[in-house]
Amino acid sequence: MSKLTPESEERLAWLLEPENPSVRYWTLRDILERPEDDPDVCKTRDAIARQPLVQELFARQHPEGHWGDDPAKPYTAEGTLGALSLLHLLGVRPDERTRAGCNSLLRFCQHEGGGFSLTQTRRSGIFPCTTGEHLPMLVHWGLGDDPRVRRAFEFVVADMSADDALDCGRYQHRDCLWGAIAALNGLAVLPAAMRSRQSRQVVRRLADRLLDAKYDFQGEHKRWLTFGVPRVWDLLSALLALAAHGYARDPRFAPLLELVLAQQDERGRWRCGSVSRTWPLEKRNRPSKWVTLDALRLLTTVPKKSR
Protein backbone atom coordinates (compact mmCIF):
# COMPACT_ATOMS: atom_id res chain seq x y z
CA MET A 1 0.00 0.00 0.00
CA SER A 2 1.07 3.60 -0.55
CA LYS A 3 2.73 5.16 2.48
CA LEU A 4 1.25 8.54 1.54
CA THR A 5 -1.87 9.54 -0.32
CA PRO A 6 -1.57 11.41 -3.63
CA GLU A 7 -2.63 14.54 -1.75
CA SER A 8 0.17 14.34 0.85
CA GLU A 9 1.21 17.91 1.64
CA GLU A 10 4.92 17.17 1.95
CA ARG A 11 5.12 15.31 -1.31
CA LEU A 12 2.97 17.84 -3.17
CA ALA A 13 5.06 20.72 -1.86
CA TRP A 14 8.14 19.01 -3.28
CA LEU A 15 6.53 18.54 -6.70
CA LEU A 16 5.24 22.13 -6.70
CA GLU A 17 8.65 23.71 -6.12
CA PRO A 18 9.14 26.47 -8.72
CA GLU A 19 12.63 25.23 -9.67
CA ASN A 20 10.98 22.68 -11.96
CA PRO A 21 8.05 24.49 -13.60
CA SER A 22 7.26 21.52 -15.84
CA VAL A 23 6.65 19.13 -12.94
CA ARG A 24 4.84 21.93 -11.13
CA TYR A 25 2.56 22.48 -14.14
CA TRP A 26 1.62 18.83 -14.55
CA THR A 27 1.06 18.48 -10.79
CA LEU A 28 -1.32 21.42 -10.83
CA ARG A 29 -3.18 20.01 -13.83
CA ASP A 30 -3.17 16.24 -13.26
CA ILE A 31 -3.01 15.85 -9.48
CA LEU A 32 -4.72 18.99 -8.18
CA GLU A 33 -6.98 19.21 -11.26
CA ARG A 34 -6.56 22.94 -11.72
CA PRO A 35 -8.08 24.27 -14.98
CA GLU A 36 -5.84 25.50 -17.79
CA ASP A 37 -6.94 29.11 -17.21
CA ASP A 38 -6.09 29.03 -13.50
CA PRO A 39 -3.74 31.98 -12.78
CA ASP A 40 -1.15 29.75 -11.12
CA VAL A 41 -1.26 27.32 -14.04
CA CYS A 42 -0.83 30.15 -16.56
CA LYS A 43 2.07 31.64 -14.61
CA THR A 44 3.77 28.26 -14.35
CA ARG A 45 3.37 27.57 -18.05
CA ASP A 46 4.95 30.91 -18.84
CA ALA A 47 7.90 29.84 -16.71
CA ILE A 48 8.20 26.63 -18.72
CA ALA A 49 8.87 28.62 -21.89
CA ARG A 50 11.74 30.41 -20.16
CA GLN A 51 13.55 27.23 -19.15
CA PRO A 52 17.05 27.02 -20.70
CA LEU A 53 16.38 23.52 -22.03
CA VAL A 54 13.22 24.64 -23.84
CA GLN A 55 15.04 27.60 -25.35
CA GLU A 56 17.93 25.39 -26.41
CA LEU A 57 15.62 22.88 -28.07
CA PHE A 58 13.93 25.56 -30.15
CA ALA A 59 17.30 27.11 -30.99
CA ARG A 60 18.33 23.75 -32.52
CA GLN A 61 15.25 23.58 -34.75
CA HIS A 62 15.89 24.14 -38.44
CA PRO A 63 13.87 26.78 -40.33
CA GLU A 64 12.15 23.98 -42.25
CA GLY A 65 10.77 22.64 -38.96
CA HIS A 66 12.89 19.56 -38.28
CA TRP A 67 15.56 18.81 -35.71
CA GLY A 68 18.80 16.98 -36.46
CA ASP A 69 20.93 16.96 -39.60
CA ASP A 70 18.54 14.95 -41.76
CA PRO A 71 14.76 15.57 -41.73
CA ALA A 72 14.25 12.08 -43.16
CA LYS A 73 15.75 10.58 -39.98
CA PRO A 74 13.50 11.88 -37.18
CA TYR A 75 14.32 8.96 -34.86
CA THR A 76 17.96 9.90 -34.24
CA ALA A 77 18.99 10.93 -30.71
CA GLU A 78 18.70 14.64 -31.51
CA GLY A 79 16.07 14.29 -34.24
CA THR A 80 12.57 15.63 -34.63
CA LEU A 81 10.75 12.93 -32.69
CA GLY A 82 12.96 13.22 -29.62
CA ALA A 83 12.70 17.02 -29.57
CA LEU A 84 8.92 17.08 -29.94
CA SER A 85 8.50 14.32 -27.34
CA LEU A 86 10.65 16.18 -24.84
CA LEU A 87 8.86 19.49 -25.43
CA HIS A 88 5.57 17.65 -24.88
CA LEU A 89 6.86 16.14 -21.65
CA LEU A 90 7.98 19.56 -20.45
CA GLY A 91 4.49 20.99 -20.99
CA VAL A 92 5.36 23.53 -23.67
CA ARG A 93 2.42 25.30 -25.30
CA PRO A 94 1.69 24.44 -28.94
CA ASP A 95 2.73 27.12 -31.43
CA GLU A 96 3.87 27.53 -35.03
CA ARG A 97 7.25 25.97 -34.22
CA THR A 98 5.78 22.77 -32.84
CA ARG A 99 3.33 22.68 -35.75
CA ALA A 100 6.24 22.88 -38.20
CA GLY A 101 8.01 20.09 -36.34
CA CYS A 102 4.92 17.87 -36.48
CA ASN A 103 4.53 18.54 -40.20
CA SER A 104 8.13 17.45 -40.75
CA LEU A 105 7.65 14.31 -38.65
CA LEU A 106 4.51 13.33 -40.52
CA ARG A 107 6.08 14.03 -43.89
CA PHE A 108 9.18 11.95 -43.34
CA CYS A 109 8.01 8.98 -41.26
CA GLN A 110 4.33 8.34 -41.99
CA HIS A 111 3.58 5.51 -44.40
CA GLU A 112 0.73 6.04 -46.86
CA GLY A 113 -1.28 3.52 -44.86
CA GLY A 114 -1.17 5.77 -41.80
CA GLY A 115 1.46 4.05 -39.64
CA PHE A 116 4.74 5.61 -38.55
CA SER A 117 7.89 3.95 -39.82
CA LEU A 118 11.40 3.80 -38.38
CA THR A 119 12.74 3.69 -41.95
CA GLN A 120 11.48 6.87 -43.56
CA THR A 121 8.01 6.02 -44.90
CA ARG A 122 8.57 2.33 -45.66
CA ARG A 123 6.02 -0.22 -44.49
CA SER A 124 8.83 -2.53 -43.39
CA GLY A 125 9.86 0.00 -40.75
CA ILE A 126 6.51 -0.03 -38.96
CA PHE A 127 6.47 -1.94 -35.66
CA PRO A 128 3.74 -2.34 -33.02
CA CYS A 129 5.27 0.44 -30.92
CA THR A 130 6.01 3.05 -33.61
CA THR A 131 2.57 4.54 -34.22
CA GLY A 132 0.52 4.47 -31.03
CA GLU A 133 3.29 5.97 -28.92
CA HIS A 134 3.36 9.18 -30.97
CA LEU A 135 -0.38 9.88 -31.00
CA PRO A 136 -0.70 11.47 -27.52
CA MET A 137 2.10 13.87 -28.45
CA LEU A 138 0.47 14.81 -31.76
CA VAL A 139 -2.86 15.38 -30.02
CA HIS A 140 -1.10 17.56 -27.43
CA TRP A 141 0.30 19.64 -30.28
CA GLY A 142 -3.21 20.26 -31.59
CA LEU A 143 -3.29 17.80 -34.49
CA GLY A 144 -6.02 15.51 -33.19
CA ASP A 145 -8.35 16.48 -36.04
CA ASP A 146 -5.66 16.49 -38.72
CA PRO A 147 -6.51 13.95 -41.47
CA ARG A 148 -2.99 12.52 -41.27
CA VAL A 149 -3.35 11.85 -37.56
CA ARG A 150 -6.82 10.42 -38.10
CA ARG A 151 -5.28 7.97 -40.56
CA ALA A 152 -2.74 7.01 -37.91
CA PHE A 153 -5.54 6.24 -35.44
CA GLU A 154 -7.28 4.13 -38.09
CA PHE A 155 -4.03 2.28 -38.73
CA VAL A 156 -3.55 1.43 -35.04
CA VAL A 157 -7.07 0.04 -34.71
CA ALA A 158 -6.77 -2.03 -37.89
CA ASP A 159 -3.20 -3.19 -37.26
CA MET A 160 -3.86 -4.19 -33.65
CA SER A 161 -6.91 -6.21 -34.71
CA ALA A 162 -4.75 -8.93 -36.24
CA ASP A 163 -4.04 -12.07 -34.21
CA ASP A 164 -0.29 -11.54 -34.59
CA ALA A 165 -0.45 -7.78 -34.05
CA LEU A 166 2.19 -7.80 -31.31
CA ASP A 167 4.66 -10.05 -33.10
CA CYS A 168 7.38 -7.62 -34.19
CA GLY A 169 9.82 -10.42 -35.00
CA ARG A 170 12.23 -9.55 -32.21
CA TYR A 171 11.03 -11.85 -29.42
CA GLN A 172 10.92 -15.34 -30.95
CA HIS A 173 7.38 -14.63 -32.15
CA ARG A 174 6.12 -13.85 -28.67
CA ASP A 175 3.98 -10.80 -27.97
CA CYS A 176 5.87 -7.52 -27.76
CA LEU A 177 4.49 -6.03 -24.55
CA TRP A 178 6.08 -2.69 -25.39
CA GLY A 179 3.87 -2.61 -28.46
CA ALA A 180 0.80 -3.22 -26.30
CA ILE A 181 1.72 -0.28 -24.07
CA ALA A 182 2.31 1.99 -27.07
CA ALA A 183 -0.97 1.06 -28.75
CA LEU A 184 -2.95 1.56 -25.53
CA ASN A 185 -1.34 4.97 -25.09
CA GLY A 186 -2.40 5.93 -28.59
CA LEU A 187 -5.94 4.62 -28.21
CA ALA A 188 -6.31 6.51 -24.92
CA VAL A 189 -6.55 9.73 -26.97
CA LEU A 190 -8.67 8.27 -29.77
CA PRO A 191 -11.27 10.92 -30.67
CA ALA A 192 -14.74 10.06 -29.38
CA ALA A 193 -16.18 10.12 -32.90
CA MET A 194 -13.71 7.40 -33.96
CA ARG A 195 -14.42 4.99 -31.12
CA SER A 196 -16.14 1.82 -32.21
CA ARG A 197 -16.83 -1.75 -31.26
CA GLN A 198 -13.62 -2.72 -33.04
CA SER A 199 -11.50 -0.18 -31.15
CA ARG A 200 -12.98 -1.36 -27.84
CA GLN A 201 -12.19 -4.96 -28.73
CA VAL A 202 -8.61 -3.97 -29.53
CA VAL A 203 -8.24 -2.22 -26.17
CA ARG A 204 -9.61 -5.27 -24.37
CA ARG A 205 -7.24 -7.63 -26.18
CA LEU A 206 -4.19 -5.44 -25.50
CA ALA A 207 -5.13 -5.01 -21.85
CA ASP A 208 -5.49 -8.77 -21.46
CA ARG A 209 -2.04 -9.26 -22.99
CA LEU A 210 -0.49 -7.00 -20.34
CA LEU A 211 -2.54 -8.24 -17.41
CA ASP A 212 -2.17 -11.94 -18.22
CA ALA A 213 1.51 -11.88 -19.20
CA LYS A 214 3.81 -14.29 -17.37
CA TYR A 215 6.19 -11.74 -15.92
CA ASP A 216 9.58 -12.73 -14.56
CA PHE A 217 10.66 -9.74 -12.49
CA GLN A 218 13.73 -11.62 -11.28
CA GLY A 219 14.87 -12.31 -14.82
CA GLU A 220 13.56 -11.24 -18.21
CA HIS A 221 11.39 -8.41 -16.88
CA LYS A 222 13.71 -7.22 -14.12
CA ARG A 223 14.25 -3.91 -15.92
CA TRP A 224 10.51 -3.26 -15.77
CA LEU A 225 11.02 -2.30 -12.12
CA THR A 226 13.54 0.39 -13.10
CA PHE A 227 11.63 3.58 -13.81
CA GLY A 228 13.20 5.96 -16.29
CA VAL A 229 13.01 9.64 -17.17
CA PRO A 230 11.66 10.23 -19.73
CA ARG A 231 9.15 7.44 -19.33
CA VAL A 232 10.32 4.26 -21.03
CA TRP A 233 9.06 0.69 -21.21
CA ASP A 234 8.52 -0.36 -17.61
CA LEU A 235 5.82 -1.54 -15.24
CA LEU A 236 4.77 1.99 -14.32
CA SER A 237 4.27 2.76 -18.01
CA ALA A 238 2.19 -0.39 -18.44
CA LEU A 239 -0.06 0.40 -15.49
CA LEU A 240 -0.56 4.00 -16.60
CA ALA A 241 -1.61 2.75 -20.04
CA LEU A 242 -4.02 0.26 -18.49
CA ALA A 243 -5.43 2.82 -16.06
CA ALA A 244 -6.14 5.21 -18.94
CA HIS A 245 -8.66 2.64 -20.18
CA GLY A 246 -10.29 1.97 -16.80
CA TYR A 247 -8.40 -1.18 -15.82
CA ALA A 248 -7.22 0.07 -12.42
CA ARG A 249 -10.19 -1.74 -10.87
CA ASP A 250 -9.39 -5.05 -12.55
CA PRO A 251 -8.32 -7.70 -9.97
CA ARG A 252 -5.28 -8.55 -12.11
CA PHE A 253 -4.08 -4.96 -11.77
CA ALA A 254 -3.66 -5.00 -7.97
CA PRO A 255 -0.60 -7.29 -7.62
CA LEU A 256 1.24 -5.32 -10.31
CA LEU A 257 0.37 -2.07 -8.55
CA GLU A 258 1.83 -3.45 -5.31
CA LEU A 259 5.18 -3.90 -7.07
CA VAL A 260 5.18 -0.24 -8.10
CA LEU A 261 4.17 0.95 -4.64
CA ALA A 262 6.96 -1.13 -3.10
CA GLN A 263 9.52 0.98 -4.97
CA GLN A 264 8.79 4.19 -3.02
CA ASP A 265 11.02 5.35 -0.18
CA GLU A 266 10.01 6.24 3.37
CA ARG A 267 8.90 9.70 2.21
CA GLY A 268 6.73 8.33 -0.56
CA ARG A 269 9.07 9.25 -3.40
CA TRP A 270 10.23 7.11 -6.31
CA ARG A 271 13.77 6.98 -7.68
CA CYS A 272 14.91 7.55 -11.22
CA GLY A 273 16.54 4.38 -12.53
CA SER A 274 17.58 5.51 -16.01
CA VAL A 275 17.95 8.78 -17.89
CA SER A 276 18.30 9.98 -21.46
CA ARG A 277 21.94 10.37 -22.45
CA THR A 278 21.04 13.17 -24.86
CA TRP A 279 18.76 15.26 -22.64
CA PRO A 280 19.10 14.08 -19.00
CA LEU A 281 16.35 15.62 -16.87
CA GLU A 282 17.37 14.04 -13.57
CA LYS A 283 20.12 12.03 -11.93
CA ARG A 284 20.04 8.27 -11.68
CA ASN A 285 19.31 6.60 -8.35
CA ARG A 286 18.02 9.82 -6.81
CA PRO A 287 14.46 10.65 -5.73
CA SER A 288 12.72 11.69 -8.93
CA LYS A 289 10.04 14.31 -9.28
CA TRP A 290 9.14 12.98 -12.71
CA VAL A 291 8.75 9.35 -11.64
CA THR A 292 6.89 10.38 -8.48
CA LEU A 293 4.55 12.52 -10.57
CA ASP A 294 3.73 9.55 -12.79
CA ALA A 295 3.22 7.33 -9.75
CA LEU A 296 0.76 9.86 -8.33
CA ARG A 297 -1.01 10.07 -11.67
CA LEU A 298 -1.44 6.32 -11.37
CA LEU A 299 -2.68 6.51 -7.78
CA THR A 300 -5.38 9.03 -8.70
CA THR A 301 -6.97 6.32 -10.87
CA VAL A 302 -6.90 3.65 -8.17
CA PRO A 303 -9.70 3.11 -5.61
CA LYS A 304 -8.50 4.31 -2.20
CA LYS A 305 -8.90 0.87 -0.63
CA SER A 306 -6.34 -0.47 -3.13
CA ARG A 307 -3.59 2.04 -2.27
Over which residues does each language-model region extend?
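Preference for long, amphipathic alpha-helical scaffolds in soluble/luminal domains
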Residues: 1-307
